[in-house]
């Protein structure tokens, strides 16, 4: 019913003209990189980086019941989400497993859900399944907007170059219409699970091209870089940010993925509520998302299971990358709760290859 691919090929070609190198992964054209891994990761951690979020999808809800409907079927409270406010929520199955994590943006006359492209089909089908007599109309709006993320400690100052005081006037977890040299776009300021600040730009195609061209040509004294999936993946692992589909999928629940802060325990029923409540009450959480450090450089495409000292399978590596900051291969993975402690050693195994890896608290610090 709902297609996976929402890649805007024209925007991809625009970024290729700016130096992007692309690759096809699971039927989605992704931007791998623009420059070296070191340069892009440096901008993410120390400067300002801009990423084209074409691995995210944009779902639109219209109708008078939209907010109330979201409140009823997802984990977070939506009833008091005001116009131009932003809030993350989780769609969970009857078993309390993650179907998808979405960022909800309230435009008043409609609502946008920003969700991972690989969970888009499941989220849209799940929403569609429960629209029964509600004034809610569901559609894929990925073709209407382009989404960009600006991240790094210099982000706010950098944006002030182009948007003036408007960049400073957007409060946390909200958005507003901004004009920069006659180019209109929506600017959102977000705080993630670790308190890290980032900005989203939502713009129509031609305005997006003008804005980004202006940024690339007038970056001033800032350590600005366009970044691709490779460096952004390193940044996510370093900061312990679970991603779709590696960590956020229906094998795991919000407790295990460490996104339980997106569950409002004071609100009424939602799908999966009873299971999630019991997990906490009866201490039934079996595993946790952890960081892991490898002792040697390995191919980041390799798949590893985790074993205890008796060779019992106790977990799995879900994301793996080389970190220029840590100067090691680091990973995210799910590990048996009793072993998910800083400094614990477990064995990572891939076929005939095995090595000891160390559990690391998240986020990683140099």
What do these predicted ranges mean?
Residues 1-11, 102, 235, 253, ...:
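Glycine-rich, small/acidic residue-mixed loop/short-helix segments
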Residues 66-106, 153-192:
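A glycine-rich (often HGG/GG-containing) alpha/beta subdomain
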């Amino acid at each position: 019913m709902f297609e996976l691919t929402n890649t805007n090929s024209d925007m991809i070609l625009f970024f290729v003209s700016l130096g992007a190198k692309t690759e096809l992964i699971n039927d989605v054209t992704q931007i791998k990189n623009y420059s070296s891994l070191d340069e892009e990761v440096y901008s993410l951690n120390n400067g300002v980086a801009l990423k084209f979020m074409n691995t995210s999808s944009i779902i639109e809800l219209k109708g008078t019941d939209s907010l109330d409907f979201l409140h009823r079927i997802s984990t977070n409270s939506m009833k008091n989400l005001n116009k131009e406010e932003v809030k993350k929520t989780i769609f969970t199955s009857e078993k309390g497993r993650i179907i998808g994590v979405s960022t909800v943006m309230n435009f008043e006359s409609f609502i946008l859900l920003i969700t991972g492209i690989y969970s888009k089909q499941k989220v849209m089908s799940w929403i569609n399944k429960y629209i029964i007599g509600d004034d809610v109309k569901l559609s894929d709006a990925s073709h209407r907007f382009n989404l960009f993320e600006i991240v790094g400690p210099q982000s706010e100052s950098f944006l002030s170059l182009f948007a003036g005081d408007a960049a400073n006037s957007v409060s946390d977890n909200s958005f507003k219409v901004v004009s920069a040299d006659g180019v209109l776009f929506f600017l959102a300021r977000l705080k993630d699970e670790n308190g890290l600040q980032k900005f989203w730009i939502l713009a129509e195609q031609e305005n997006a091209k003008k804005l980004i061209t202006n940024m690339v040509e007038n970056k001033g004294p800032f350590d600005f870089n366009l970044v691709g999936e490779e460096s952004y993946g390193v940044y996510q692992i370093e900061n312990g940010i679970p991603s779709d589909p590696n960590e956020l999928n229906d094998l795991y629940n919000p407790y295990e993925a460490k996104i339980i802060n997106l569950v409002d325990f004071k609100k009424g029923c939602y799908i999966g509520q009873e299971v999630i409540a019991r997990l906490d009450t009866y201490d039934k959480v079996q595993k946790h998302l952890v960081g892991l450090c490898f002792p040697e450089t390995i191919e980041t495409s390799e798949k590893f299971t985790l074993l205890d000292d008796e060779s019992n399978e106790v977990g799995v590596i879900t994301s793996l990358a080389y970190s220029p900051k840590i100067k090691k291969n680091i990973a995210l993975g799910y590990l048996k709760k009793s072993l998910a402690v800083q400094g614990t050693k477990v064995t990572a195994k891939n076929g005939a290859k095995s090595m000891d890896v160390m559990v690391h608290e998240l986020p990683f610090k140099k």
